[in-house]
Regions:
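Broad, structure-driven detector of short, well-ordered beta-strand segments within folded domains
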Residues: 13-18
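Compact structured core domains
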Residues: 20-69
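Nucleic acid-binding interface residues in structured DNA/RNA-binding domains
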Residues: 3-10, 55, 64-151, 155-157
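Intrinsically disordered, low-complexity, charged terminal extensions of DNA damage-control enzymes
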Residues: 1-3, 40-41
Length: 160
């Protein structure tokens, strides 16, 4: 069973979702692909991992780096899972590009070429935004391209 709850952030309402295995979704309400992976059979409620996610978000939105990560249950293809794993390795306060992630992924896969556009598609479908930091990925020209930036005042990825 998937449980959901809402979190009021400085950037707007966020829907949190989790099942028995961990966090399955963190979406801003205006975000592209909002709740795309939320099963129809979900209910509003609470469970420990949702509380952990709220505490993580409280720390994050206070301007500090959280020293823990809520348990995650990322649901997606092997390719998307590999990209999301790389996102989790981007240090707080730093950014990288889609091209750099594509090169990293190619190295992991024995040199098999990966396009930056394919990486961008996986980043854009990240179901656990903020916690899995897709906002730390920028275009090759340094532009903000993350789908989280639907808010009128996005956070600076270089400081988060």
């Amino acid at each position: 069973m998937t449980y959901t709850m809402h979190y009021d952030s400085p950037l707007g309402k966020i829907l949190l979702a989790a099942d028995e295995e961990g966090m399955t979704g963190v979406w801003f309400e205006a975000q592209k692909y909002f709740a795309a992976k939320l099963p129809p059979e979900h209910e509003e409620g609470t469970m420990p991992v949702l509380g952990d996610a709220c505490r993580w978000l409280d720390v994050y939105f206070s301007g500090r780096e959280p020293d823990f990560t809520p348990k995650l249950h990322l649901i997606g293809s092997d390719f998307r899972q590999a990209v999301w794993a790389l996102l989790l390795q981007i240090p707080y306060g730093q950014t990288t590009t889609y091209g750099a992630l594509a090169k990293q992924l190619a190295e992991i896969n024995g040199g098999k070429r990966v396009s930056a556009q394919a990486v961008g598609g996986a980043v854009g479908h990240n179901p656990v935004s903020i916690i899995v930091p897709c906002h730390r990925v920028v275009g090759s020209d340094g532009s903000l391209t993350c789908l989280l930036y639907t808010s009128p005042s996005p956070r600076d990825p270089k400081t988060s």
